[in-house]
């Protein structure tokens, strides 16, 4: 069994997200979420410490809109197509 050091439980989801950055809007998909942050799959992840504004399309109701900061990211690799680009973000409530 893996030792997960997270303090808050995460839920697996598949919610579309629009990320507003200093360079414009980027589309992605939230694949897991907690009260403190989320993992977002996208073609061109931002780098750690970059700030962004998220608009997450929830299945019911109004979208979640929140400022966030990138904690870590994984870039696509031309040598390994099993690596999925994405990033972990922390919500700035």
Each language-model region and where it sits:
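Short, solvent-exposed secondary-structure boundary/capping segments
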Residues: 39-42, 74-91
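Hydrophobic core residues within well-ordered beta-strands of beta-rich domains
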Residues: 13, 26, 52, 64-66, ...
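Short, surface-exposed secondary-structure edge patches
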Residues: 8, 41-45, 61
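Hydrophobic beta-strand positions in extracellular immunoglobulin-like domains
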Residues: 56-58, 70, 91
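Short beta-strand-centered aromatic/proline hotspots
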Residues: 28-29, 66-73
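Short conserved beta-strand and strand-loop elements enriched in small hydrophobics
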Residues: 15-20, 49-64
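A generic structural motif
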Residues: 34, 70-74, 93
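N-terminal helix initiation/capping motif
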Residues: 1-35
């Amino acid at each position: 069994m893996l030792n997960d050091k997270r303090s808050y439980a995460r839920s697996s989801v598949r919610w579309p997200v629009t990320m507003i950055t200093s360079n414009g809007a980027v589309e992605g998909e939230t694949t897991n979420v907690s009260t403190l942050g989320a993992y977002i799959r996208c073609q061109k992840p931002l780098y750690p410490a970059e700030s962004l504004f998220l608009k997450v399309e929830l299945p019911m109701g109004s979208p979640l809109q929140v400022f966030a900061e990138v904690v870590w990211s994984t870039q696509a690799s031309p040598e390994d197509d099993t690596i999925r680009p994405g990033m972990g973000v922390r919500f700035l409530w």
